[in-house]
């Protein structure tokens, strides 16, 4: 997989309560230099946020109210494991932010992620971090990487999943689910929509969305080299174009936007 430039800044925004962050009922953190683990009680409605730069992020359902976030570091071609560290920060309403940071001049908070993948003397530090998250029912999750696949399975609330070089696959029985990448496919599935608009983007890849049959939305789909396919009856608006499809599903309302350059876009009814 091709790597991104050595330094990057990714602005991110997440609407959250302004309430003072509260400590989890039970927490534990361990970092032995190669493996990292955090576990704690996270209430429904709170957020778990995980940010990575090189490596995958995988989310699976947990049992009970205890969340578990673990990571393993792997060095390639002389990578320095000691130059990659983990940070944790309690969030409002009992949530948690966990970040993997490369280099001394990196930082991470709720609103931004800056990680500089340089080792000694400006040389690239070839270390990958693989995150695994066990997610309690009703907890929202925001996970992201730069070079790596992102997968969310068995979520029951809101999901935001992003990467740059890799595929994104996200499934939630709740919603909404939003997903973006640049070089990779997007697959998103939800049985409920929650509130808010829906956004899906890639450049080199296809987009497939499995959506509730009751969907009502104002839809805009865009591609350059690809096509459109939908299971939903749509009232078209504007000029019909092989590169752009806009219209209304059901009664309209929320916005559903999906765009790619090289790939197709498919809307399917959830089974």
Label every model-predicted segment.
Residues 150:
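Short, small-residue-enriched loops and turns at beta-alpha junctions
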Residues 21-51, 56-144, 153-154, 160-162, ...:
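Acidic (Asp/Glu) and glycine-rich low-complexity loops/linkers
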Residues 1-10:
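Bacterial N-terminal signal peptides that target proteins for export
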Residues 209-213:
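Loop/turn-rich, solvent-exposed surfaces of beta-rich toroidal or solenoidal domains
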Residues 9-17:
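Bacterial N-terminal signal peptides
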